[in-house]
A protein has these predicted regions:
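Active-site-proximal beta-alpha core segment in soluble small-molecule metabolic enzymes
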Residues: 1-159, 168, 189, 227
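C-terminal active-site-proximal or functional interface alpha/beta core segments in diverse enzymes
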Residues: 127-130, 134-246
Length: 246
């Protein structure tokens, strides 16, 4: 029901498995409304994603050969997951520590040589940030990469997927994110970096499922077990199968 409402409101879907692709298909999502981001991916899932016309988002350099071998040829539109490397800091707090590999530049060149015509980049560096700075900082890094790809490779990207990461306040002392302020921050970076370089056409995508939905429902559970190790654990009669992203 929720997916159908999102479909009616013009949203797309982010899928990472055959089950999620199947749910997307059942709700009427198709083509570039679907972003397929997966790792350790079975061949049949690449095939299914292509059948639906979804955008396959590559997570690793080795995925290029895997997709080409599985599908026989690379799709005309593909996306690359970018990892900027180093420490990612927001408000003096380390949000994540991506590995050093800067996946994006070399891979874009290879895809171009193999016939891919439309490109996008994607990044997922942090989860459930309660900070208005995260998205604008991430956008700056991705937009700078977009400009480099255009200048050094002659490739003009079609879209940038900022992924998720904007969280909600689970604790009373936490301040909620200001989505209008976040949006304005991304807009300012867009106009500062992309527009002057002739890239104002680029489409921006987000994956804000938690931010959009989590505040409007509740999972009620009962504590059924306690465990004492180096921490105190309370086990409940629910699991990720009941609510994957609370």
């Amino acid at each position: 029901a929720i997916l159908r409402i999102l479909k009616e409101e013009g949203c797309g879907v982010d899928c990472s498995s055959k089950v999620e692709l199947t749910m997307a298909e059942a709700c009427g999502f198709k083509g570039q409304e679907i972003m397929f981001s997966s790792n350790d991916t079975p061949e049949e899932e690449y095939i299914f994603a292509r059948e639906l016309g979804g955008i396959i988002n590559l997570d690793d350099f080795s995925n290029i050969a895997e997709v080409e071998e599985t599908l026989g040829t690379l799709p005309k539109t593909m996306s690359l997951r970018f990892n900027p490397g180093g420490y990612f800091k927001i408000a003096n707090t380390i949000m994540d520590n991506p590995e050093e590999a800067k996946f994006g530049m070399t891979e874009a060149q290879i895809l171009k040589e193999k016939g891919v015509e439309h490109f996008g980049i994607h990044a997922f560096l942090a989860s459930n940030t309660v900070s208005n700075e995260y998205y604008p900082v991430l956008a700056r890094q991705l937009f700078q990469l977009v400009v480099r790809i255009k200048k050094e490779l002659g490739i003009s990207l079609d879209f940038v997927n900022l992924s998720g990461g904007i969280g909600i306040p689970y604790r009373p002392e936490q301040e909620p994110n200001d989505i209008l302020l976040i949006g304005q921050g991304v807009k300012e970076v867009f106009e500062e970096i992309l527009v002057p370089n002739g890239l104002g056409h680029i489409r921006l995508c987000t994956e804000l499922g938690r931010f959009m939905l989590a505040p409007y429902g509740a999972l009620i559970t009962k504590v059924i077990h306690f465990k004492e190790t180096y921490r105190h654990y309370a086990g409940v009669d629910a699991c990720a199968a009941n609510l994957m992203r609370p």
